[in-house]
Amino acid sequence: MSTSSSNGLLLTSMSGRHDDMEAGSAKTEEHSDHEELQHDPDDPFDIDNTKNASVESLRRWRQAALVLNASRRFRYTLDLNKEEHYDNRRRMIRAHAQVIRAALLFKLAGEQQIAFGSSTPAASTGNFDIDLEKLVSMTRNQNMSNLQQYGGVKGVAEKLKSNMEQGINEDEKEVIDRKNAFGSNTYPKKKGKNFFMFLWEAWQDLTLIILIIAAVTSLALGIKTEGLKEGWLDGGSIAFAVLLVIVVTAVSDYRQSLQFQNLNDEKRNIQLEVMRGGRTVKISIYDVVVGDVIPLRIGDQVPADGVLISGHSLAIDESSMTGESKIVHKDQKSPFLMSGCKVADGVGNMLVTGVGINTEWGLLMASISEDTGEETPLQVRLNGLATFIGIVGLSVALVVLVALLVRYFTGTTQDTNGATQFIKGTTSISDIVDDCVKIFTIAVTIVVVAVPEGLPLAVTLTLAYSMRKMMADKALVRRLSACETMGSATTICSDKTGTLTLNQMTVVETYAGGSKMDVADNPSGLHPKLVALISEGVAQNTTGNIFHPKDGGEVEISGSPTEKAILSWAYKLGMKFDTIRSESAIIHAFPFNSEKKRGGVAVLRGDSEVFIHWKGAAEIVLACCTQYMDSNGTLQSIESQKEFFRVAIDSMAKNSLRCVAIACRTQELNQVPKEQEDLDKWALPEDELILLAIVGIKDPCRPGVREAVRICTSAGVKVRMVTGDNLQTAKAIALECGILSSDTEAVEPTIIEGKVFRELSEKEREQVAKKITVMGRSSPNDKLLLVQALRKNGDVVAVTGDGTNDAPALHEADIGLSMGISGTEVAKESSDIIILDDNFASVVKVVRWGRSVYANIQKFIQFQLTVNVAALIINVVAAMSSGDVPLKAVQLLWVNLIMDTLGALALATEPPTDHLMHRTPVGRREPLITNIMWRNLLVQSFYQVAVLLVLNFAGLSILGLNHENHAHAVEVKNTMIFNAFVMCQIFNEFNARKPDEMNVFRGVNKNPLFVAIVGVTFILQIIIVTFLGKFAHTVRLGWQLWLASIIIGLVSWPLAIVGKLIPVPKTPMSVYFKKPFRKYKASRNA
C-alpha cells in the first residue's frame, strides 16, 4: 500500500525573482554586471544555501583564505568535526544501542541477580503486577515468548492496570504512581558548556593574548623603573581592559547559548493525543507514562517503547534507530514499537511499556550531546568580510609598527615633555624595551580594532533575539538559516485548510436520499436504513472518537477538524457511535490517502456480512458510484441523477464549501482474504459503490488573512494557494482571502488542477509555474513539482505543509513551514520553522522577522565599519607623521567593547518595522554592503577623520592650550580626541538604525534596550574620562570641552540627513572592486 498522509494539504506559491536590491530598491539596468558578480564560482564565501549543504562544501570556505583568530571567529558557527562525528554516530546507532543494552542488563544482573532469559514470573513494581526490569527487557529484546508468558498484550495491560480501549484513569495520583514505579518519559541531558568554558574560548583570541603578554612586560618594566605605585598603571590598565573584553564576550556568548538551549527544549516538547478514562486528551510527550494507550496515525512519532494493541496497515519507519531506510510492518506477529520511530502508513493503538531512560531512544539521547551549531549563509559571508577586513587591519598595523620603530630608532619621536625618546648610546636598555613594548602594543591594538570580531556576534545576537520574539509571534525556528532566508522569500506556497481558513468545520449542507435536505442534520426525511448505513460508515471509517462524560455533560468529539465535523453531523442524525463499533468490527482499512483523496474500511457484521465504506472528495467518490439510496431506502441507478449531484457539488464548492461524499458497497465473505498476510495486501474494492450522502463543510476564512496577503503583495512576495480541495472551492477561498483579485483572473493557468500540472513536461511546468496562483486537487507530489519549477525559475520559495507526504516539498523548499497544530511529526522534522497557531498571518510575521535579521546585520556593519575606518586612518596618519597615536591601547579596547558587544547588542535587537515590508525581497546574493551603506559610512568616516585629525595637529591652538604645560596640554588634546571620537560613535548609532530613512529616531521608544545601551555607554565614558584618568590615559575635561565633544558627535545627525540626499549609483560598488581581479584572473587563465 502506498504511503499516505493526513487529511490536511499543503499550499505552494511563488513570484517573480528580485535578485538585486539596494536596501530594498528595485532591479537596475546594470543587472548583467551585478549578476556576473553574484555568480562567481571562485568565491569561497559564496554559499547561498546551507540547508542541504554537504560538510565538504561548508569546510571549503574555511580553508580558502587566511583567517585571523579562527578559534574565536568561528565560535558561532558549525563545528564540522562534531558534525562528521555525529553522522558516524548515527550510522552506528543500532550497534551503540545494543552495547548500552548489554551493559545495562549486565549491571542489573550484577546488582539484582537477574538471570538472562529467565522465565521466572515477574515480581511486582509498586501496586502493579509486573516488574520494571522484565518489562523493559521484554520490549528492548522484542521477546515474543515473554509477551506470551504475560498473557499477550491484554495480559500486560491487565498487569499494568490499564484498559486497552479507555487507557488509564485521568486521576493525577495514578499518573504520579506510574512515574514513581516505571519512570518518567524524560532522559538526562548532557550538560552544556558552563560559563568558564565560554571564558576560556574568549581567552583564545590571539590578539588579546599578545596584548596580555605586552601588558605583563610593560607591567614588569614599569614597576622596575618607576616603582610599584606608578609603574603598574600602563601595563595594569591594558591587562584590565583585556580581561574586561574577555569577560563581556564570555557573558554575551553564555547568554546566547542559554537562549538557544531553551529554544531546543521547546522543539523537543511534542504534543500528542492519549486515551485516558475513555476520552482523547492532548499531553506533552514528557507526561506519557507506562500503561498509556496512544493512538498512532501517519506521520506521528512513536513517543515511547510499547506493544501494538490493534492496527490497520501500520508501517513504521525505524531508520532513526537502525540507520537503515526500511519500512517495517507491524501486526500481532511483530507488535513491538520503538520510541523515536515514525509512523509511515496506517493507523493503530499502542500500549506504552517503557519510557524515558528505559527505552533505547532515551539511552541514545542521553548519550549523545546535541549541538546547536549550524552554518548560515549570512555567517559564511560575514566571516569572509571579517577575514578581508582583518587582513587589511593586520597590514595597516604592520605598516604602523614599522613606521613607529623607524621613527623611534632614528630619534624623530618625542615624549610628552618634548624630549627626544631615543638617543643612541644614551637611552638605557630598559627604556628602549619599554618604549618598544608600547609601540608594539599600539600596533596590536590597531589589529584589535580593525578585526571586526563583532560581526559573527551580531549574527548570533540578532538570530537569538529574533527566534525568541518569533516564539511570541507563534513561530518556532528549527533551523537558524531559515530566519535569514525568509527575508529573501519571493513566494509563499500556502496550504488552504487551517492556514488560510480557521479549521473550524461544520456541515452546513447535505444531499441524501437523492435530494437536498432542508436541514443539514435533520434525519426526519430519511429512511432508517439509509441513516443506519451513513452512521456505520461514519463511525467506523474514522480515526476520531465520541466521548460521553459519566456526569452527563456535553458530548466530546475528537479527531481531525473534518472528521469532527462529520462525526458531529452524524451524531445529530442519530448515530450510536459506541453501539456501532461494538456490533461490527473493522477487518481491513485503507487510511485516507492524499493521492487518492479518499479512505475506506471493510466492516464485518456478525459472522457473514461484509460492508465496505468509503469517504472522500465528493466528485472522486461520485465517479465510483453506480447507485444511490433514495429517501425510501431503496437502491436506484445513479445515471439519471449524476448530473444533479455534479451540479450540487459545484454549487457548494462555489460557496467555498468542502464537499465530502459517503458511499458503501457489500462484499461476499468468500471474496475476503482469510489469512492476515493476504488481508494486509488486499486492495479494497472501490467500484460499484452506493452513494449515501454528500455533505458541504464550511471552513471560514481566518480573520486578518486578507490583510496579510495584501502585505505580502506590497512586499513583493507572491502568495499561491495549493490545496487538495475542489478547484471551485479553492477559487472561492482565494477570492475571499485576496489571493485572487477578481473572477476575471480565475482562468488557466492562473488556477489549475494538480493533475493538469503534473502531466506537463518539465520545461512546460517551469513556464506555467510562474503564472500559477491557485492549484486545486493537488497531491503532495504536485506541490513538490511546483516548488522545483519555481526554484529553477530563480524564486526563493517558502512552503507550508502538515502531512507526512509533504515532507519532500518542505525539504526541497528554501524555507519549509510546518503546522504546529495539524502538522505531523514527520512534517515538523522536515521543516525549518513550525507555525504554532497554523495561521497564515504568522507566516507573514516570519517574513518580517527574516527581513529584520538581514537589516539589523547591515545596520551593525555600517556602524562598525565607520569606527574601523575612522580609527585606522586617525592612528595611521598620526603615527606616520608624529610617531605617536592619539588613541591609546586602553582607549581602543574600550572603543572595541562599544563596537563588538554593546553596539552589536543595541543594533541587533532592533524590532522589525512596517518599512521593511515596503521593500522587495532581499536578493539571495545581494552585496552585504549596499551602495547606500557605503555612502553613509564614508560620509561619517570622512567627517570623523577630518575633525579628529584637525584636533590632533592643531588642537593645542584651537583649544587654547598653548600657554599650558606642554605635557598636560598634549594629554588634554588627546583626551578631547578620544572623547569626541566616542561621542561620534554614540550619536552615529542612531544613524545606523535607519540607513535609508531621514528620521533616525522613528521607533526608538520601542527598543528600550537600545536607549539603555546608549545611556550606559555615555555614563561609562564620563566615568572613564573623569575618574579613571591614570587607567585610561585621560585627564579631566572642563564643561566647555565636554560640550564641544558632544557637539562634534551631534553634527553626525544633520550630516547624515545631508548625506542621504546624495544619489548613489545603482550598480553595487563591489562590481567595481571585483572587475579588475576578474579580468586579471581571466588573462592568467587565457
Curated annotation (Swiss-Prot):
UniProt KW keywords: ATP-binding, Calcium, Calcium transport, Calmodulin-binding, Ion transport, Magnesium, Membrane, Metal-binding, Nucleotide-binding, Translocase, Transmembrane, Transmembrane helix, Transport
Known activity regulation? Activated by calmodulin.
Q: What is its main location?
A: membrane
The record ties this protein, via Gene3D superfamilies, to: 1.20.5.170, Calcium-transporting ATPase, cytoplasmic domain N, Calcium-transporting ATPase, cytoplasmic transduction domain A, Calcium-transporting ATPase, transmembrane domain, HAD superfamily/HAD-like
Which InterPro entries does the entry mention?
ATPase_P-typ_cation-transptr_C, ATPase_P-typ_cation-transptr_N, ATPase_P-typ_cyto_dom_N, ATPase_P-typ_P_site, ATPase_P-typ_TM_dom_sf, ATPase_P-typ_transduc_dom_A_sf, Ca_ATPase_N_dom, HAD-like_sf
Its membrane topology is listed as:
Multi-pass membrane protein
The UniProt record lists the EC number as 7.2.2.10
Q: Where is this region: Disordered?
A: 1-50
Query: Which residue ranges traverse the bilayer?
Result: 195-215, 234-254, 383-402, 440-457, 858-876, 888-908, 929-951, 964-988, 1007-1028, 1039-1060
Q: Membrane side Lumenal: which residues?
A: 216-233, 403-439, 877-887, 952-963, 1029-1038
Q: Name one GO biological process term.
A: pollen development
Class of enzymatic activity (EC top level): translocase
Q: Where does Mg(2+) bind?
A: 802, 806
UniProt KW Heme keyword: no
SUPFAM superfamilies reported for this sequence: Calcium ATPase, transduction domain A, Calcium ATPase, transmembrane domain M, HAD-like, Metal cation-transporting ATPase, ATP-binding domain N
What is annotated as the active site? 495 (4-aspartylphosphate intermediate)
The segments labelled Interaction with calmodulin in the record are 57-68
Q: Does the keyword Nucleotide-binding apply?
A: yes
Show the GO cellular component annotation of the record: membrane; plasma membrane
- Which stretches does UniProt call biased (Basic and acidic residues)? 16-42
Please state what the annotation says regarding this protein's domains. Answer: The N-terminus contains an autoinhibitory calmodulin-binding domain, which binds calmodulin in a calcium-dependent fashion.
Q: What is this protein called?
A: Calcium-transporting ATPase 9, plasma membrane-type
- Which species is listed as the source? Arabidopsis thaliana (Mouse-ear cress)
